[in-house]
Amino acid sequence: MAAMRRLAYLFPAFPVLHQTFTLFEVVGLKRRGYEICLFSLRSGGGGPQQNEAEPLVAETEYCPSLLSRAMLGRFFHAVRQRPGDVTRLFAAVISAWRERHPGASDHSEAPAATTLSFGERVLAVYHHNAWVYLAKSLVLVPYAIWLGDRLRDRGIQHLHAHWATYPVTTAYLVKKWAGIPYSFTAHAYDIYMIDRMLPAKVREAAFVVTCAR
């Protein structure tokens, strides 16, 4: 990353107390002279945090909620100005979702529900069902448009996302919308919980880092 002195980081939530690795990765890069712009799909939920997180929270730009005026206004402006490109973003999600890694085990269905309570069954479907995953991924199109425009306005040269699920789906779509290259760090559950879309996201990335096999 020697040539990337100005880059953005995207998190699903930031800061999160037990995810110290993301916090200290950003701190380490800043100490080495990188200009890091922080973005998060949602807030970290408050509560106690490491001392190093406090100044970074003030720097973090949180994506507006889906139904906010800022998000919907940006999305419908994009629909008016670039309708074909917006349509291609939705098509890219569906195409990537259909692609599976050869020989991958099927984690697209919820776990056996015989020992689960009703609430646990609902959560299992929400987190594991492939069709739910597709729906939640399609919802990221407006986020990618908003984020892509923000990154381009700020002159960001590269986007790095943590977790191979929704943050990387957003980065994948940002590249298609704004032409900004991305990389990502995958961890564990995000690789194995649902393997949909992963081949496309890996193929499009500048590089991938993972701590799991």
Residue ranges, per PLM feature:
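Histidine-centered beta-alpha loop that forms part of the nucleotide-sugar donor binding/catalytic region
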Residues: 11-12, 41, 164, 186-189
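A short acidic, amphipathic alpha-helical/loop segment
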Residues: 25, 170-174, 196-201
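A conserved, positively charged/aromatic
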Residues: 131-132, 181-187, 192-206, 210
